[in-house]
């Protein structure tokens, strides 16, 4: 769940699953994808923020925040032909139009799955990822 009370489901591709398996092999932990140092709990969100802040400072970048990743997804996925509605749904934005709020109960899972695969395929072309 995000900011809304609705579940936020983002389908995983085979690339994501393989990537998570590699992370688990690296950490040696099965319960949490990103375990804390002791492994008893998941790593805190601010750990990522702090690591990004240190990296930005050390690399002399002007600035960068994890939010820039969301902005990049929204922009690049649009250039790949993924509709604004699906990009919004994938980012967990609440649909506020009357039809969505009161009538549309469809989960858009199949469309999300297609969009996520298109995203991975597009990134693979950009950075030549091999699944």
Question: What do the PLM-derived regions correspond to, one by one?
Answer:
Residues 1-3, 17, 40, 80, ...:
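Catalytic-site neighborhood detector that most strongly recognizes the C-terminal catalytic loop/helix
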Residues 54, 58, 76, 80, ...:
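Active-site catalytic microenvironments for nucleophilic, acid-base chemistry
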Residues 60-63, 125-131:
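Surface-exposed helix-capping loop/turn segments at secondary-structure junctions
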């Amino acid at each position: 769940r995000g900011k809304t009370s609705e579940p936020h489901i983002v389908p995983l591709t085979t690339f994501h699953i393989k990537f998570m398996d590699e992370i688990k092999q690296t950490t040696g932990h099965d319960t949490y994808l990103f375990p804390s140092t002791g492994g008893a709990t998941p790593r805190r969100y601010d750990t990522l923020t702090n690591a990004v802040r240190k990296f930005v400072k050390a690399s002399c970048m002007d600035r960068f925040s994890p939010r820039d990743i969301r902005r990049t997804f929204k922009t690049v996925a649009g250039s790949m032909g993924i509709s604004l509605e699906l990009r919004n749904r994938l980012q967990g934005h609440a649909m506020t139009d009357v039809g969505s709020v009161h009538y549309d109960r469809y989960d858009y899972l199949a469309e999300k799955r297609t969009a996520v695969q298109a995203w991975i395929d597009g990134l693979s072309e950009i950075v030549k990822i091999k699944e």
